[in-house]
């Protein structure tokens, strides 16, 4: 295997090195002065004589050129009216993830809006009509993120929350986890509301056998499958034996395949 020969420094190398170092230092100084961001640890400025090979020098040169390139949004910054500074890359990433999270929620709402809403065993309109009366987030338990506007960010803590939250919500896995958590929470609240009762014990066992995504659709479609009627402290339980029987009847329909569930793979 051929070894890289030791670099022979030319006058052109010296001129290019001096130019790159000057541009890099100017950018570091300008960014520090204008935005209060210290980039000195982001890039190395070794002595020209320290480069052992031409390949090593060329790699360093490429890093310097990328660092000072205005198209590199990782090192282009924006300061808003509250004095919060962020790179254009971070701002664009949050905006992109916000749009994707909104798209996922919008798609989900379109999938469920025509489903029947049933209360007391009778259809009382559709899930979409219920979302108009209440709000989509009240009905589904899932909020649609607001549009991202960097000018509205008042603190770095808020910026981090948006960055992490939108990255999470832009993933379909996030909504799968929400459905799983909702399913588990409902099972637990039924257990705690009645402690031990044969009707509720049987209901719990039946609920455990339902996949989380199926449960989510049942939760949307059947009024009695609601957190509002149960209390984990056992102090304000509105769910009656008749209501438990009604939920059992809904699960009978589900187990017979009489309930149209089509959010599979959402």
Curated annotation (Swiss-Prot):
Region (Interaction with the viral DNA polymerase): 256-258
Annotated localization: Virion; Host nucleus
Region ranges (Intermediate): 74-172
Key words of the record: Covalent protein-DNA linkage, Degradation of host cell envelope components during virus entry, Degradation of host peptidoglycans during virus entry, DNA replication, Early protein, Host nucleus, Hydrolase, Phosphoprotein, Viral DNA replication, Virion, Virus entry into host cell
InterPro entries linked to this entry: DNA_terminal_Gp3, DNA_terminal_Gp3_C, DNA_terminal_Gp3_sf
Family: Belongs to the phi29likevirus DNA terminal protein family.
Native species: Bacillus phage Nf (Bacteriophage Nf)
Listed name of the protein: DNA terminal protein
GO CC field: host cell nucleus; virion component
GO terms classed as biological process: DNA replication, synthesis of primer; symbiont entry into host cell via disruption of host cell envelope; symbiont entry into host cell via disruption of host cell wall peptidoglycan; viral DNA genome replication
O-(5'-phospho-DNA)-serine PTM sites in chain numbering: 232
Ranges where the record places region Priming: 173-266
Region (Disordered): 1-73
Summary of the function given for this chain in its UniProt record: Acts as a primer for DNA elongation during viral genomic replication. Acts as the small terminase protein during packaging. Recruits the phage DNA polymerase to the bacterial nucleoid. Primer terminal protein (TP) is covalently linked to the 5'-ends of both strands of the genome through a phosphodiester bond between the beta-hydroxyl group of a serine residue and the 5'-phosphate of the terminal deoxyadenylate (dAMP).
Site keyed Positions the 3' end of the template strand at the active site of the DNA polymerase: positions: 230
GO molecular function: hydrolase activity
Membrane-spanning intervals of the chain: none
Quaternary structure annotation from Swiss-Prot or TrEMBL: Interacts with the viral polymerase; this interaction allows the initiation of TP-primed DNA replication at both viral DNA ends. Binds to ssDNA. Interacts with the replication protein p1. Part of a DNA-gp3-gp16 complex.
Span(s) of short sequence motif Nuclear localization signal: 25-34
One Pfam short name: Phi-29_GP3
UniProt superkingdom: Viruses
The keyword Cell membrane belongs to this UniProt entry's keyword annotation: no
